[in-house]
């Protein structure tokens, strides 16, 4: 649709949430001539207030004034605001269109979009893909769930390519946006509290990443994920398919053979010794294959791809080695906010473990990690306000179980319980909002406490 017509149709845009995505969307909307109002039910960080003020954008914090919101022609909603929020219910009753910042920004750029989602591995794959492109000299921007607005660079510092991490919450409010390259790493239960505890609702959200794709576009996915396989058979994606797997299965475009990774695209075949990959572990092999396929599809030269796959340093709060104290390794995996992420972490561990679990439960099924916990963990520390569900599942399955109400207490108890040669692993399985501002805050506190031992 012609962008001028959209402007005429959508005179007033109200943005709910004034974090990174909301503030960026406000700047872009203002630049495109809309009447813009920003409302945040919480407090707005000073840097975002300054940004809004500098662009002459009206805002409010600590409330949602209905008279200033319900008159909107279109709403741009922060992904953190659930559909059950009272203001969202009223907007839906009124029939006001509600979109995401990514959807809005996509209207105003013709850049190539490489979009990544999945229950686990999406941040690592996003950062790795971005690293590969930038090292190869591509004019690439980084956006989405990694903490960067897409709208702000579209408004003020446009790029030729964007590498975008997409959460299910962002995908929920995307309609006309199209990914040129879509990557779906895996689907396991997560955020079910936001999806009425219906797994299919979450699956449907993830598959929105292939919405509007044509045969000119690419869909990269893990070939051995049973949910993805079922949904592909049901949905018949229009995009050209690029499955990846650990072994050379029929039809896969990325795989390993004879201790090499092999990637096959129309831009040629890429090979690399598997032991030269910077990221170790099976889950990171999949991340490297997905990034490698995407990179070959945008014609990154083999020598650039090989160099970047071998020198990438990883993602903070994801299996991050913090320190070794008196023969005990401390690993920060605070980004493991679901059970499957913790499963990958436990699978990669080779020493006896003291495991720190807990936080805000999102409908978790801990049976997925039960056998690994019984096999590898000799002490559990439950870090949270309400640990009843954890006790109900794990009591009697591990020799020692302790509770902690702060990170300082959790690390102090782990220090006493760990023996030389052990690893203390923070891999919580849960969201962080009971005791911490975010998973980053939780991980930062863990690192600070470890360094103070």
Residue ranges of model-derived segments:
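N-terminal leader/targeting and accessory segments in enzymes
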Residues: 1-100, 104, 392
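Residue-level signal for inorganic ion chemistry
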Residues: 29, 75, 116, 145, ...
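Phosphate-binding loop of NTP-binding sites
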Residues: 30-31, 67-70, 79-223, 227-239, ...
